[in-house]
Amino acid sequence: MKFINSRFELKYLLTHKQYYNFKSALLLYTKKDKFTFNSPNGKYFVKSLYYDNHNFLCFNNKLEGEQSRVKVRIRCYEKNKNDNKFVSIELKRRFGDLIKKDSSRVSLNDYEFYLNNGYWKYYNSVINEFIRINAKYCFSPITT
């Protein structure tokens, strides 16, 4: 499954009171996603593995407010590794105020195959771009 989304992100500094008022107002216009809906407390677990190079290009571009930047990450939604049936490959690119996010769900087994063998069993446009960006910037999974 492939998901593509373009949006504008504007960020504002809010007081606690403004935040809670805004959050309450938004509830009238939003629906819970399947993860929140199935969760007993209305919250769910998200684990992200970011890709960057050894100079921390992505991290530094974010800190410096670079207007054109890219973020590559792998996400899963279960605390225990063996409970994850899939992971989400996410490519997030910023062009000024415009944010473009491409995402593709792949099985955990297929992602582990890629990690162990250096290539994918199959390809789609998100996987192709994931490979291209990682090669261009020498990205690899980064933990700190």
Where are each of the predicted segments found?
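Phosphate-end processing signature that detects enzymes handling 5′-triphosphorylated RNA
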Residues: 1-144
